[in-house]
Amino acid sequence: CSFDTATNTLTMTDKSEGVSTVPTKYDLRERQRVSLIRDQGSYGTCWDFAATSALESALMPEEQLLFSVDHMSMSNSFNVNQYDGGEYTMGMAYLAAWQGPVYDADDPYGDGVTRDDLAAVKHVQQMLIIDGKDYQGIKEAVFKYGGVQTSLYSTIASSKTKTPYYNKQTNSYCYMGQDKPNHDVVIIGWDDNYPK
């Protein structure tokens, strides 16, 4: 900044452009902002789990809620069953229409039955869509809001699946191919110095 005494003017220059607003390492587990880890079983409900987990994370740590995956996957406006799979826009539509979320205790997962008489216990007012390769934007969203739902291509069908994309030494999965995403997960942190 500089001050011109002749014109009595203060000039300030913003030099912060390009400066990261997030740390090089961040983990929502260390801040009690990760919901219960659940198993989708053989159903194609990863998109529901990712959507509900991201919402639960956004409300933490102040509110420790568990939302129904069953309700989102069966009481939405998309005529699909739990084996058909889905995608993030289906979860967004369900939440934006205030069809849910509802509590998991009121509509538990895996019984193949849902209740249509349940009202949304939260009203989602705003959702953020981040460009797929905007890693800085993803980090900022995790840092500010909590878990971020994302889609990836996975070659892993079960814990017994062997794949060249999974590194057991670093517990990491990295697929850089061109196949379309087939699985949804929630990003809960990062480490810029993680061994690759």
What would you call each of these model-derived segments?
Residues C1-K196:
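Catalytic-core signature of thiol
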